[in-house]
């Protein structure tokens, strides 16, 4: 995993989220500070940021890298590929609503082009210490079926419940929505032998539907890439983007073909 660290609230929240996930999974953590080319002062600043991050992560074994790039999102994507990280964690942009995700240029770039999964922390995020549940946003399409298989295995490995949530925005056949969700629950059982919880959130739009759902402290929301995503790239569609902006928990977006 790689955390994009900046000297602001979003950077600290990304760092806290990355550390929490590392403690749960036992994975390797790299903290990166991106600086523009031809800027010696910014390079020094990046090193200072990493030193600051190191103090905050005294109990978490981590690597620290200052990396030169013309854009933070691009730099994190290149660095993740170079060190074979399978997850990039970033924080919300300044000025967003507390408890919700606000995308800046870095997050927006990653959510449309990243070669690896991207996790975004809501504004004001503070870890609870325990991972309580994985929730996968589900619609009936191949990328989501692949994600059901992967997330059911992840839930089994991590020892946490898996919830499959879909949205009834009163524009589709509600019976078909529930039938599709039942098939996804069956897929989770066939893949990993776990009984996934099925949840249909109803509302006149995505934000309203998200408000009706129950969210636990320590929960993660996962979204599959859009059908428009290139192979092995993240691309967030319109519905998923609305979901991300309304989510009160950290959100992970998987690249197409995620393994």
Cite the ranges covered by each PLM segment:
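Glycine-rich, Arg-bearing micro-motifs that act as flexible, cationic patches
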Residues: 90-109, 131, 205, 223-246, ...
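Short, structured coil segments at secondary-structure junctions
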Residues: 25, 106, 113-115, 192, ...
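Short, structured interface segments
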Residues: 105-126
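A short, acidic, amphipathic alpha-helical segment used as a generic capping/interface helix at domain edges
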Residues: 185-186, 204-214
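Small/aliphatic-rich secondary-structure junction motif
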Residues: 1-44, 58, 132-178, 182-199, ...
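Charged docking surfaces used in two-component/phosphorelay signaling
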Residues: 66-75, 201-208
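Active-site charged/polar residues at nucleotide-handling catalytic sites that mediate phosphoryl
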Residues: 83, 216
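Short beta-strand elements of ligand-binding domains
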Residues: 89-92, 117-124, 251-255
């Amino acid at each position: 995993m790689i955390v994009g660290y900046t000297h602001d609230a979003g950077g600290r929240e990304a760092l806290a989220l990355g550390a929490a996930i590392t403690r749960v999974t036992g994975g390797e953590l790299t903290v990166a500070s991106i600086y523009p080319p031809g800027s010696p002062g910014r390079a020094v600043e990046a090193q200072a940021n990493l030193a600051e991050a190191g103090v905050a992560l005294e109990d978490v074994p981590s690597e620290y890298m200052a990396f030169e790039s013309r854009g933070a999102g691009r730099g994190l994507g290149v660095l993740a590929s170079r060190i074979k990280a399978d997850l990039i964690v970033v924080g919300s942009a300044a000025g967003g609503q507390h408890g919700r995700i606000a995308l800046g240029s870095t997050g927006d770039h990653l959510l449309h082009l990243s070669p690896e999964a991207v996790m975004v922390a809501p504004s004001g995020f503070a870890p609870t210490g325990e991972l309580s549940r994985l929730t996968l946003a589900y619609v009936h399409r191949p990328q989501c079926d692949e994600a059901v298989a992967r997330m059911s295995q992840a839930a089994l490995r991590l020892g946490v419940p898996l919830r499959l949530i879909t949205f009834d925005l009163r524009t589709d056949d509600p019976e078909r929505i529930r039938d599709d969700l039942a098939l996804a629950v069956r897929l989770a059982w066939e893949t990993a032998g776990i009984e996934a919880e099925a949840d249909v959130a109803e509302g006149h739009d995505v934000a309203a539907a998200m408000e009706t759902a129950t969210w636990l402290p320590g929960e993660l929301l996962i979204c599959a890439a859009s059908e428009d995503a290139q192979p092995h790239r993240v691309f967030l569609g319109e519905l998923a983007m609305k979901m991300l902006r309304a989510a009160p928990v950290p959100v992970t977006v998987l690249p197409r073909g995620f393994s």
